[in-house]
Amino acid sequence: MIFHLQEEITEGHEVYKAWFEAEAIPQIEAAGGGCLGCGVDAENENILHLVMETPSMDVVEAFMGSEDFTKARQSAGVLVETTQITVLKQ
């Protein structure tokens, strides 16, 4: 399953990316997923875009429902209340 995730970040892309690559990616890969693309909006660098692949929506829901993962995202500057997920049809 491929999905697009958009959310606002407050600490800058480099801070987010450092956390994402060091902590989030290993967890996502361990769950059978991966990141296909990561970047910020060209006109607003506070808007992060990710294109991710996971085996199922259950995996996404497990990460989004994890209190520890949510706290880590917040520490990396994510405003979790702004997260929007769009499942992409192949």
Region spans (language model):
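Short S/T/G/P-rich N-terminal loop/turn motif that feeds into the first structured element of a domain
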Residues: 1-65, 82-90
